Amino acid sequence: MIELTKKITDTVALEKIDPARLKTLSLPLDARIKSRQKVQLTSGEGVGLFLERGTLLRGGDVLTNADGVLVKVLAANETVSTIVCSDALMLTKVAYHLGNRHVPLQIETGFVRYQHDHVLDDMVRQLPGADTCVDVQVEQAPFEPEAGAYQQGGGHSHGHAHSHSHEKPHSHTHNH
């Protein structure tokens, strides 16, 4: 079994790759957020992913190993809800309400997309003003959500931790 251990991030190195050398791996988002797993190339050949923890794979990424095997990642089609709206303000409101529910979103000109959830579809349809322009389409399409403000590669992460205190500010200086 081929073991893939590294995502190539050097843009110069990526530009030098002969596309004919690339094998392909098609994965939905839920698989592209796992750094250690067994998967199959589109050719059917089994491979193991042993990537740095927290690595998010995006369509177009190239993986390699010590033997120089090159594998291009494709974002697989999966069941998604695509919200299409010609009114930019209404589409912004849709994105706001979905974001308030911490739903990973793919945001593009004219549409937003999320992993299909009929409850969220109904919520979007019931937003004030949605009946005038919002079209909820359940379809098979690649899903590439926004990375988020605190994430380098995107996806879902719990690596950033911080604490909050509700104590009143006070001085730590003492006069002795």
Curated annotation (Swiss-Prot):
CC terms in the record's Gene Ontology section: cytoplasm
Family annotation (Gene3D superfamilies): Urease metallochaperone UreE, N-terminal domain (2.60.260.20), UreE, C-terminal domain (3.30.70.790)
GO terms of molecular function: nickel cation binding; unfolded protein binding
Keywords: Chaperone, Cytoplasm, Nickel, Nickel insertion
GO biological process: protein folding; protein-containing complex assembly; urea metabolic process
Pfam name, any one: UreE_N
CDD domains: UreE
Region (Disordered): 147-176
Location in the cell: Cytoplasm
Biological role stated in the UniProt entry: Involved in urease metallocenter assembly. Binds nickel. Probably functions as a nickel donor during metallocenter assembly.
The family this protein is said to belong to: Belongs to the UreE family.
Identification of the protein by name: Urease accessory protein UreE
Organism: Alcanivorax borkumensis (strain ATCC 700651 / DSM 11573 / NCIMB 13689 / SK2)
Lineage, top ranks: Bacteria, Pseudomonadati, Pseudomonadota, Gammaproteobacteria, Oceanospirillales
